[in-house]
Design a protein with these regions (language model features):
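Canonical alpha-helical transmembrane segment with a positive-inside/aromatic-interface signature
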Residues: 67-146, 152-171
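Structural signature of multi-pass, alpha-helical inner-membrane proteins
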Residues: 169-180
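Short flexible/disordered coil segments
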Residues: 23-33, 146-149, 153, 172-173
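Membrane-targeting alpha-helical segments
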Residues: 1-94
Length: 180
């Protein structure tokens, strides 16, 4: 009998077998499709990873769920993700439609408050990211970029090294006074 805190031995065995099978399927799919399957390169990749996790949890925890159906669903999501990534790579128009552009949040030690507002990022979050990246002074920060994945990249140096224009390619919200 299954209760809130206990489950029968047969249920536990089914869950353990489900874990073994579905994780084997995940490993096989990842080996076939490549590591990009779980890379957070775009918001679509992030959504795909969440969907994969949701399917995985459903199959493992719901003992009435078919392992074959779960495996097909996982394969389908990865296949669609691969197709979607290929199509957006080939078409700049589709890429710009479905992918967020990175946004400059800080440049040469100055916080770009207008861009913080546009991206709904708080100054405290920005400062926390600076600490996390071991930036010691605002003057050492060359740029902070909110990437299309939602991650923040902090480019800092104690030298007066100029940023290569290629590093800032595709970044929105670069101040007008910056000559790249």
């Amino acid at each position: 009998m299954e209760t809130w805190t206990f489950a029968s031995a047969s249920i536990i065995v089914k869950v353990l077998i489900s874990i073994l099978v579905i994780f084997s399927v995940i490993i096989l799919i990842t080996r076939i499709s490549g590591l990009r399957t779980f890379a957070k390169m775009s918001s679509f990749d992030f959504a795909s990873t969440i969907a994969i996790g949701s399917i995985l949890a459903s199959v493992v925890l719901n003992t009435n769920q078919s392992l074959l159906k779960g495996s097909i669903a996982l394969g389908g999501i990865v296949l669609f993700q691969t197709f979607f990534s290929y199509v957006t790579r080939k078409s700049k128009r589709l890429d710009s439609l479905f992918t967020n552009s990175p946004v400059m949040l800080m440049y040469e030690g100055k916080i770009l408050y207008e861009n913080l507002d546009k991206t709904n990022v708080g100054e405290d979050d920005l400062i926390a990211k600076l600490r996390e990246s071991n930036a010691l002074k605002f003057s050492e920060v060359r740029a902070v970029i909110l990437e299309s994945t939602g991650d923040m990249s902090v480019l800092h140096s104690s030298e007066t090294t100029e940023l290569d224009a290629k590093v800032l390619q595709g970044v929105k919200g670069i101040p007008d006074y910056v000559n790249l």
